[in-house]
Amino acid sequence: MPSQTAPGRRSTARGSGSRRSARRGRTDTGGSPAPDRAPDRDRAARRARSGGADGPVPVRVHPRPGLLGGRLRLQQLVLIEVAAALVAVGWTISRPVAAGFGAVSLVLLVLAVVPLRGRTIPEALRVRAALKARRKRARTHLPPPGTDPALAPALELEPALRTCTHATEADFGGRPVRRETGMVGDGTFLSAVLLVQAKDLPLRPARTARPLPLDVLCSALRVDDITLESVQLVQHTQPAPAPHLPEQSLAARAYRELADGTATPALRLTWVALKLDPERAATAVRARGGGEPGARKALQRVTDQLAGRLNSAGFNVTVLDERELIAALAISSCVNPLATAGRQGSGGGSGSGRRTQETNRFWRVDDRWHSTYWISRWPQLGRPGGAPGRIAVPDLVNLVTGAPALASTFSLTAGHGTGGSVALSGHVRVTGRSESEAVALGRQVEARAQSTGLGLARLDLEQAPGVLATLPLGGAS
């Protein structure tokens, strides 16, 4: 595998239009269940668990770099100031000159203020140019021969992605045991993935009885001398009964008899992806040998630490190896298993043709249509054992992923916000069997979100970056 910190690969990947576009979809919020404001994150997590669960979680929007107030971008302010300066200068010269400068100022004000489908005109032009660049690249790029068919759709989204295995040996009772951890990166980051499951119990507890502790996830942003880029939580849900079953089928009738049958998933997988930027954690990487080996060791340290904490919190945690990681990417992409199996042995390369396509409103893989939304507004969230908010986090996730879709995906990425807060960025993706079904599912999800106060913005012209943000790769950055 090429070096994850090679300067050439870093510059190539950072120039990708899709990654730049994904960065624009990021939102900083300071309302995570346990924002880490102290250097000692273990202490902060303990304080949050003991004394921070008395009331609902207030979600506050923090301005990100280049954003003033909450709505006005720095570039918009510059355009407004330039327009005002032109009018003032023209007025001091003469009225005819002021009239000419006023016309130019009017154009600048239109560019700065007038929205186009929720974006300023310069931003809309940049987004459209990035989409054209991705489409042009898609016409010429195919995964190389020998690519695993399960990984090929992800490579069509981000050609620089590579997977690898980091092997370690542990001594158990005088007997060395080899452990393998799968990692994925594109030259600018390296990620490992955990599969988190509830422990087997004779009676399954209620959905809200043991939610995944977000304070523990946020505490993994800094472990020892290692600072992660982000921690991503991904929940992939397939509904029950299957949407294609007739209403009078035995399975459909059985689920209707359940008290909460419409919210009962057939499959719900939870992954936690840990994303390391070797440049951000340069000191920790150098302390462990530098280069790709040092980055792998640093990521392995954080992965083991978080797995241990989640196990102590009452969950079964599995660190995915390389094959399991590729399978997780395929499941999250909702690829057609028949299409993947049909390419086994063919190499999945240039002879198999391209399997994905991005349109203005959808991303298609095989015969599945995906529509991705960015969470633009959060409701007041409640905590278990405390004063209720408008809705609890498990109920919110269950509501937006409970549509009768082929699959639904919820992604929550925690990163470093302003003033030592935790930045949260959320995305929702629904998958249908056709374009018309995806449209209907999108409307249903939008209506469900609106009923709770959750704001969803469909990522028109940015569906490919949106899908990348919902795959267990560590989140958009």
What role is predicted for each listed range?
Residues 205, 239-248, 283-284, 329-333:
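A short acidic (Asp/Glu
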Residues 213-216, 228-231:
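Membrane-embedded segments
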Residues 229-266, 271:
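Structural flexibility/helix-modulation signal
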